[in-house]
Amino acid sequence: MAHYTRNVGIFVFNQVEVMDFAGPYEVFSLAEDATDMNTFKVFLVAQSAEQIEGRNGFTVVPQYTFDACPELDILIIPGGPGTRAEEKVSKVLDWVRTKADSAELVLSVCTGARILAHSGLLDGLGATTHWNSLNELREMAPTTIVYDDRRFVDNGKNGKL
């Protein structure tokens, strides 16, 4: 069976919740250690190459900008207070839609679902988010089935989300 490395791009932005991007980063990185294969190439992507200040002052520098980002097999949109600003930026929404279109899998963590909703990627699909944002998600994505009793939602292979 042929093996290839999957590119995992994690979008980071100011006021991103550290746990929401660092957790997936660690999980995908450790999966490579467990298999002794180059299964995943995990990297951070932002609008620009500038340092990102996550929640509570934690700083990171993205490896790629939107313009230089390689093709993604997996796109991860983390949450945090910064999603409220990012969901209004057309460049962000356009980039998310473009990368999601060619990705094998798209997922969000917590309030990252807000960005997917504003991108139109949750239309007609199931989703969940932080308990305090459930009603807002229902308002911003009226055709989305918002679950308040689930920690995750899998929309199947064709759903990508």
Regions picked out by a protein language model, each given a short descriptive name:
Residues 155-161:
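Conserved anion/nucleotide-ligand pocket segment
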Residues 106-107, 127:
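A short beta-strand/loop micro-motif in the catalytic core of glycosyltransferases
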Residues 121-139:
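Short, glycine-/small-residue-rich phosphate/pyrophosphate-handling segment
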Residues 113-114, 130:
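Conserved beta-strand edge residues that scaffold enzyme active sites
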Residues 1-106, 114-118, 135, 144-149, ...:
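Extended, subdomain-level signal for the structured scaffold at the beginning of enzyme domains
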